Amino acid sequence: MTRVKRGSVARKYRKNILDFVSGFRGAHSKLFRTANQRRGRSLAYAYVDKNNSKRAFRRLWIARINAAARRDGITYSSVIHSLYKNRIALNRKTLAQIATLDAYCFSMIIEKVSKIKI
């Protein structure tokens, strides 16, 4: 077998990993072995937290809609149910935006939905 000298390739590989972890604290940004382990762990956390943030935002939207709906004397579940039954295509994100930025418009939507018989 022929000898493979991979000095420049190995340096580039290590440099890329150390650049990736440059903002980490202590040895995790300076020593290659610990940096490589931290990099793997950070990518795993990033993957998990990507889905957790979606979950957290949905909870936030529901809380905002519920607070605005209760101000108008109706519960969150009945708002969503009425919207679904009347085929009004407003998602939770949009409803939460309307509820926080334009309370009058949200009240009009609630009034319109609650008048229609289910």
From Swiss-Prot:
Major localization listed first in the record, in broad terms: plastid
Gene Ontology molecular-function annotations: rRNA binding; structural constituent of ribosome
Keywords: Chloroplast, Plastid, Ribonucleoprotein, Ribosomal protein, RNA-binding, rRNA-binding
An example Gene Ontology biological process: translation
Pfam families per UniProt: Ribosomal_L20 (PF00453)
GO cellular component: chloroplast; ribonucleoprotein complex; ribosome
Compartment annotation: Plastid, Chloroplast
Keyword Ribosomal protein attributed: yes
HAMAP family, A to Z: Ribosomal_bL20
Role of this protein: Binds directly to 23S ribosomal RNA and is necessary for the in vitro assembly process of the 50S ribosomal subunit. It is not involved in the protein synthesizing functions of that subunit.
Family: Belongs to the bacterial ribosomal protein bL20 family.
This protein's name: Large ribosomal subunit protein bL20c
